[in-house]
């Protein structure tokens, strides 16, 4: 049940943190978009070793819950940096959340972009080449 009194009481407390949420969304979306484009390009071009690494990464990201990925990045990366002799205490903890969400978005976007590009019929691509368009222009 929705209690309007509780809603009115908690809404000002929640809305104060809205800029932080928006910042996490925008940064993770931007980094995920870049990573997704890179992963899709690697998989489409079938670069020998990188294509297999990208396929494993995408499979891992798509098959594990985001909360598990957040735990691995949030607790694992500082521990790994500590093992390497790098002090991670100066790094703000929200950076690890940016990384976790960015990797998650990148994995999903990479597969989405790859499937979208491969869904274009070959005749359409050949028509673009016949019209004198470059490779990247036929993609756009």
Spell out what each predicted region is.
Residues 1-140:
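Transmembrane alpha-helices and adjacent helix-loop boundaries
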């Amino acid at each position: 049940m929705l209690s309007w009194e509780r809603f009115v009481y908690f809404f000002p407390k929640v809305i104060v943190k809205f800029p932080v949420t928006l910042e996490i969304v925008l940064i993770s979306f931007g980094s995920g978009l870049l990573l997704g484009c890179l992963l899709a390009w690697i998989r489409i071009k079938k670069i020998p070793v990188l294509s297999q690494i990208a396929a494993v990464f995408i499979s891992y990201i798509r098959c594990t819950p985001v909360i598990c990925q957040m735990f691995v990045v949030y607790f694992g990366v500082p521990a790994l940096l500590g093992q390497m002799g790098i002090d991670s205490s100066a790094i703000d903890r929200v950076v690890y959340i940016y990384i976790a969400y960015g990797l998650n978005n990148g994995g999903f976007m990479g597969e989405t972009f790859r499937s979208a590009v491969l869904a274009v019929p070959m005749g359409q691509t050949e028509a673009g080449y016949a019209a004198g368009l470059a490779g990247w222009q036929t993609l756009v």
